[in-house]
Regions:
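Flexible, low-complexity junctional segments that flank or bridge functional domains
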Residues: 1-176
């Protein structure tokens, strides 16, 4: 169900069928679960995609180089200076009122859902502020619905935020 085969082929010549052939030769009936996990993890690593992971009860196969080579777009020192330790936490958001009556929300991930009640409380607390900073730098992503839910609090107008494609068949390019 991977949607980026064509893109990866264009970007760096990925030939998934050749990769399949390469790694299928390394799989044997007498392999342990750990050995199979390692081979399949290495195979998925060929995709060079930080969003492709394989989970087992003992480990997660992931593309570490994607995370390690991802350019940092923030300074922990700067975050600590502004956010400090006197902040509130709700639904994965850290928030506080900064000097000059500026509201600040730090959102490092959209991995979990935000409760409407939690958002109500946070925004009510920050309502008297003269301005609001929503800091999503270094956000690892997650649920599109969480990002939409937060953004919807700042407009009354329906707004197109993107498109999604769904897998419709077994072929590499079978998407809606």
């Amino acid at each position: 169900h991977y949607c980026f085969f064509d893109y990866k082929k264009e970007q760096y010549g990925l030939d998934w069928n050749a990769i399949y052939d390469k790694y299928s030769r390394q799989i044997a009936d007498d392999m342990t679960d750990n050995q199979l996990f390692e081979v399949l993890g290495n195979m998925l690593g060929e995709l060079k995609d930080g969003h492709v992971n394989m989970y087992s009860s003992w480990d997660v196969a992931r593309n570490w180089s994607w995370h390690e080579n991802y350019p940092s777009n923030l300074s922990d020192t700067l975050i600590n200076r502004y956010l400090g330790t006197d902040y509130r936490i709700s639904s994965g958001m850290r928030y506080r009122i900064l000097d000059d009556n500026i509201g600040y929300i730090r959102l490092q991930s959209f991995a979990s859902s935000m409760g409407e009640g939690n958002l109500d409380e946070i925004l009510y607390y920050l309502m008297p502020c003269n301005a609001l900073i929503i800091d999503i730098r270094d956000n690892g992503g997650g649920l599109v619905t969480s990002a939409e839910q937060l953004a919807a609090r700042f407009t009354n107008t329906p707004l197109l935020v993107g498109y999604m494609q769904h897998k419709t068949g077994r072929g590499h390019s079978d998407f809606s």
